[in-house]
């Protein structure tokens, strides 16, 4: 790559060309409208060119962006930008996006990942497929059903069979989910995990209490709107709309159950009507969690400015 005409950003173990797009994405995640974020990214670029800066340390770039935002009266955006850049650069964060089938966990997870620059998004359906490779049908038959049909293979029918089947199905998948969380925290890798198997009351408390783990539950309160999501999904994917509609009442039971368990565990519930609004609400929730993480470490804004990425 010919870097002679680029401004080079230098990290601790790498160098890369200054990217207005990456900076604009970071500013958007911090709360700026995309058009304003890109304009400020251009301003920063032009400022560096005017000063004839050819190589800039990443921490110095972060400091310049922070103070430029302050100078433009974007104080809250500046604080969020600083928080995100420091945390994502140095600390792992695991974001869990739960919700019943059809509420949009995949869409929201990928939107958040794009905003924050988190490269890894894992669906619990994928983890379920891995678990099926190592656990036989005879041992856990519910694992081989869908979340809303697991009740069919229960060996007893005490209580609400639909919810009990869902719980048995999810428990096996959560074993794999917890393994992924452990691995990411140990290796310092950020990840977003999304899916219907993320049941708050079935996940170990040590994960819910970990400041590096953020759990958000999505829902759609209106039944008709929820049902319309399946029709819309069927037009753009190969997923069988008829099957979802056949078990829609059970899916709604699971939706209500997941919202109830989230509230019981103090996990924020976000209704997913408009994607942009949902993403903004989720980012605000994640930001508040990260503030708690930083407070526990006793770091001030000045500390964050000085700490290299």
Curated annotation (Swiss-Prot):
A GO molecular-function descriptor: kinase activity
Instruction: Identify the InterPro entries for this entry.
Output: 2PKG, ATP-cone_dom, P-loop_NTPase
Q: Which organism is it from?
A: Methanocaldococcus jannaschii (strain ATCC 43067 / DSM 2661 / JAL-1 / JCM 10045 / NBRC 100440)
Q: What does the record give as its pathway?
A: Thermoadapter biosynthesis; cyclic 2,3-diphosphoglycerate biosynthesis; cyclic 2,3-diphosphoglycerate from 2-phospho-D-glycerate: step 1/2
Q: What does this protein do?
A: Catalyzes the phosphorylation of 2-phosphoglycerate to 2,3-diphosphoglycerate. Involved in the biosynthesis of cyclic 2,3-bisphosphoglycerate, a thermoprotectant.
**Which reactions fall under this protein's catalytic activity?**
(2R)-2-phosphoglycerate + ATP = (2R)-2,3-bisphosphoglycerate + ADP + H(+)
Q: What is this protein called?
A: 2-phosphoglycerate kinase
Q: Which family does it belong to?
A: Belongs to the 2-phosphoglycerate kinase family.
Could you say which EC number(s) this protein's record lists? 2.7.2.16
Q: Name one Pfam family in it.
A: ATP-cone
Alphabetized, the UniProt keywords read: ATP-binding, Kinase, Nucleotide-binding, Transferase
């Amino acid at each position: 790559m010919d870097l002679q005409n680029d401004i080079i950003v230098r990290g601790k173990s790498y160098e890369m060309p200054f990217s207005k797009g990456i900076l604009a994405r970071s500013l958007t995640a911090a709360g700026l409208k995309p058009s304003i974020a890109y304009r400020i990214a251009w301003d920063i670029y032009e400022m560096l060119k005017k000063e004839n800066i050819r190589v800039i340390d990443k921490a110095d770039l972060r400091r310049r962006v922070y103070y430029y935002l302050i100078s433009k009266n974007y104080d809250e955006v500046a604080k969020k930008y600083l928080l995100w850049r420091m945390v994502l650069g140095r600390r792992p964060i695991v974001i869990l996006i739960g919700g019943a089938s059809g509420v949009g966990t995949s869409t929201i997870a990928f939107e958040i990942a794009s905003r924050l620059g988190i490269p890894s998004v894992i669906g619990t359906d994928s983890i379920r497929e891995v678990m099926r490779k190592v656990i036989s049908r005879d041992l856990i038959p519910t694992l081989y059903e869908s979340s809303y049909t697991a009740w069919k293979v229960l060996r007893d029918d005490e209580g609400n069979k639909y919810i009990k089947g869902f719980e048995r199905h999810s428990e096996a998948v959560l074993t794999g989910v917890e393994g992924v969380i452990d691995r990411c925290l140990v290796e310092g890798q950020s990840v977003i995990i999304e899916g219907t198997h993320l049941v708050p009351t079935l996940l170990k408390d040590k994960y819910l209490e970990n400041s590096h783990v953020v759990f958000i539950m999505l829902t759609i309160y209106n039944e008709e709107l929820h049902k319309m999501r399946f029709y819309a999904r069927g037009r753009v994917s190969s997923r069988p709309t008829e099957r979802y509609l056949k078990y829609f009442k059970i899916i709604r039971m699971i939706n209500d159950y997941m919202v109830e368990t989230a509230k019981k565990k103090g996990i924020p519930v976000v209704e997913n009507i408009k994607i942009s609004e949902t993403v903004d609400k989720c980012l605000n929730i994640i930001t508040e969690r990260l503030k708690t993480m930083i407070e526990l470490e006793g770091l001030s804004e000045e500390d964050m400015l000085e700490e290299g990425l």
